[in-house]
C-alpha cells in the first residue's frame, strides 16, 4: 500500500495530518510526501513508520513534465527508496534520485533563486512583471517567465516555499505576502 500526501507546504499542518493518519494505517503502508521543499526527516517520526517514509515530489503539469524527485531521510529503509524509484518509473515518470536531504530538492533549488531574481527586478523598480517575463521567454525560448510560474503554482505556495529559504531578499517576502 502507498499513501501520497499532497498538502500545502505548511509544516504544522503536515505534522497534524500525519499524527491523525498514523494510527489508522496498516503498518505495511508506505507513506510519501509530495513536498517540493520540506525535508522528509521533519515528518518521519509522526508517521509511525519512519523506515517507510520518504518524499516523492512530482513536477507541475506531470502530464507534460513527467518528472519526479525521490528523496529519503536517514531512517528510510533503502528497499523502500528503490521500490519508490521503480514505482515512479512504472507510472512513466522520470525518477530522479536525490541522494541527500536538501530543502528545495533538485528542481526548486534551481527554480527559487530564479523566481527571487524576477521578484527582485520588480521590487527594485527595474522593470514590470510583463517585461521581466518577456525578457526571459524571448531571451531563452522558455514557455514561462517567473511571474507566469507564480501564476501556475499560486502565490500562497510560492510564499511558503520562499519562506523555507534562509537568504530571502528583504523586499521580496513582504511583496509576496501582500500579493496573497
Locate predicted features.
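Short alpha-helical
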Residues: 12, 38, 105
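A ubiquitous short alpha-helical element
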Residues: 3, 100-105
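Rossmann-fold dinucleotide-binding core
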Residues: 30-100, 108
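N-terminal alpha-helical segment
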Residues: 14, 63-64, 114-115
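Rossmann-like NAD(P)-binding element
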Residues: 1-30
Amino acid at each position: 500500500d502507498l499513501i501520497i500526501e499532497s498538502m500545502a507546504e505548511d509544516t504544522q499542518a503536515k505534522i497534524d495530518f500525519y499524527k491523525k493518519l498514523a494510527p489508522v494505517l496498516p503498518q505495511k503502508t508506505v507513506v510519501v510526501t509530495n513536498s517540493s521543499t520540506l525535508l522528509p526527516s521533519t515528518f518521519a517520526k509522526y508517521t509511525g513508520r519512519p523506515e517507510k517514509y520518504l518524499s516523492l515530489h512530482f513536477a507541475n503539469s506531470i502530464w507534460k513534465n513527467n518528472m519526479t524527485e525521490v528523496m529519503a531521510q536517514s531512517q528510510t529503509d533503502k528497499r523502500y527508496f528503490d521500490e519508490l524509484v521503480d514505482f515512479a518509473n512504472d507510472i512513466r515518470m522520470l525518477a530522479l534520485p536525490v541522494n541527500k536531504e536538501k530543502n528545495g530538492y533538485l528542481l526548486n533549488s534551481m527554480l527559487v533563486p530564479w523566481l527571487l531574481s524576477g521578484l527582485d527586478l520588480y521590487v527594485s523598480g527595474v522593470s514590470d512583471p510583463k517585461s521581466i517575463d518577456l525578457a526571459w521567454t524571448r531571451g531563452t525560448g522558455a514557455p514561462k517567465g517567473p511571474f507566469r510560474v507564480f501564476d501556475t503554482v499560486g502565490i500562497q505556495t510560492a510564499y511558503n516555499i520562499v519562506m523555507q529559504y534562509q537568504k530571502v531578499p528583504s523586499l521580496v517576502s513582504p511583496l509576496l505576502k501582500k500579493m496573497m
